[in-house]
Structures are given as structure tokens and as C-alpha cells.
Amino acid sequence: SSAASEVYKRQRMAGAPVSVVANSGSGNQGITATMPVVAAARWLDIDEPTMLRAVTLSNLIAIRIKSKFGRLSNLCGATVAGTGAACGITYLLGGGYHEICCAIQNMVGNVTGMVCDGAKADCALKISTCVNAACQAAAMGTRGVRVQSTDGIVEENVERTLDNFAILSTHGTSDSVILDLMLNKEHAPDAE
């Protein structure tokens, strides 16, 4: 459950010897990419093989995004793991490639910019925020609803959106970087 997940996160950040799965070298990211998907599968009464596929998808997407960031990022890793969780939950809700891309766009449009200010107990709060955003992104994505390419750093193409996310994570969250990303996007077709 989400409450149990929060307890583990707090215990880990306080130094308690709690075993967890890691993602991209981080226990918190492993918890964030895994437990919300497991909780959603249980709540939806999904069979174990489907749940395992969704958890695998979540973790692989988180790894894919994190690989674009490099070794050090100024953005909170929960945003990456939460994006993976959104994809896993979307899969559990019956979403395919298009809906998963919508969920990614929703996450990048929502939680991008959450700054990493060191590993500490209140990381659990940031994780909770990203898990809530993941559920929202999945619910919207399964309906084909997503942040539009006219907004912020989101592009029409999901890979370009993730490239922008990575640029922001490695080159800073300063206004000049954000403005440059927004002004130099590939222009999407006019929405009519």
C-alpha cells in the first residue's frame, strides 16, 4: 500500500536497514518505480504476470529516462521514477503505446523542475507528490489527454520531450535554459 511505501521510504532515509529494490542506483527511485504499480495492480485485481510486465515497463522507462540525464542531475529522481510508474499504471489500465506517451508528456508537463536538494527524510514527500502525479498522468493518458506541445518544454514527439527534460536536468533550471528550450522547440501543427 501507499502508506507502507511511505513508511519504508522514511525508514530508509533515516538510516534504517530496510531492503528495497534499486533503480538507477537509488532505492527511492526503485520504490517509486515499483510500489505504485504493484499497489495499482492489486487495487485493480490484475493477475501477477500482467503486474510483473507493468513493473518491468515502469523500471525500464525510468532507466531509459535516467540514462539521458547522465551521472549527476539537479532534478529530483522521483520525477523520473514517477514517470516510469505512470507508464506502468497506464499499461495496467489497458493503455498502449499512444496512451503511455501521453502519460509521459503529462508527467514532464507536471513535475519537471522539482529540484534535488540532497537525500533526506523529506524525499518521501517529493515521492508522494510524484506518485500522485503518476496516477493523474495515467488516468489522463488512458483517455488520450495530455499536455500539449504548445506548453512549456513538452514537444509533439515524446523523445524530444525527454531530450528537453534531460537538458533541463543537466544544464540547470535557470530561466534562461527554460526560455531557450521553449523558444527553440520544433513547432507543432496548429491546434484547431
Show where each model-derived region lies.
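Function-dense linear segments that define catalytic or interfacial modules
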Residues: 9-15, 38-42
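Glycine/charged-rich beta-loop-alpha catalytic/anionic-binding loops adjacent to active sites
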Residues: 12-22, 62-72, 115-120
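Conserved phosphate/anionic-ligand binding catalytic regions in large, soluble enzymes, centered on
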Residues: 16-35, 76-80
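Alpha-helical support elements that line or immediately flank enzyme active sites
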Residues: 30-46, 86-94
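Feature representing long, continuous alpha-helical segments
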Residues: 63, 83-87, 132
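Functionally critical mobile loop/hinge segments
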Residues: 92-192
